[in-house]
Amino acid sequence: MLIPPINLHAWIEEHRHLLKPPVGNKCIQQDGFIIMIVGGPNARTDYHYDEGPEWFFQLEGEMVLKVQDDGVARDIPIRAGEIFLLPPRVPHSPQRAAGSIGIVIERVRLPHEQDGLQWYCPQCNHKLYEAMFPLKNIETDFPPVFDHFYRSLALRTCSQCGHLHPAPERYAAVED
């Protein structure tokens, strides 16, 4: 049975209150493609690794897509009305401004593929930690990996320069 068309503007207005921290992300379809509406602000310090491409369409406001490009950290600004196709296997960290709303489309993962979350030292860009896992549900699979990294001083301390990667406030009292 075919799913009827979704009035995207009406959907956003009806669900705008859900497109805010701490999650800010709502999946509207998962049949062949994962289609998400994402709102800002956010303050992610992780980089997502996806075996497939990701398509970004910025509807309202602006975002910066931080990427690791051949070992170099780069910023790619994406403004309202702009689209960007991120190639497969490029670590990326979406930074969304307050009040911004965008669409992200990813393909459903193939059975053998794994997603990853990576963290890099903000001082010297050395990779601090990487976790690879089969992604089933982006809203429930990411938080345990975030918890593992942010609760560990050892994982957050750069072996190259000694800098301690910052953790969100909610982790301040639970560090090892």
Curated annotation (Swiss-Prot):
Pfam families: 3-HAO
Swiss-Prot/TrEMBL cofactor(s): Fe(2+)
Highest taxon above the source species: Bacteria
Binding positions for Fe cation 1 per the UniProt entry: 48, 54, 92
Cofactor, how bound (note): Binds 2 Fe(2+) ions per subunit.
InterPro entries in UniProt: 3hydroanth_dOase (IPR010329), RmlC-like_jellyroll (IPR014710), RmlC_Cupin_sf (IPR011051)
Role of this protein: Catalyzes the oxidative ring opening of 3-hydroxyanthranilate to 2-amino-3-carboxymuconate semialdehyde, which spontaneously cyclizes to quinolinate.
Family statement drawn from the similarity comment of this UniProt entry: Belongs to the 3-HAO family.
Subunit structure: Homodimer.
The protein's name in its UniProt record: 3-hydroxyanthranilate 3,4-dioxygenase
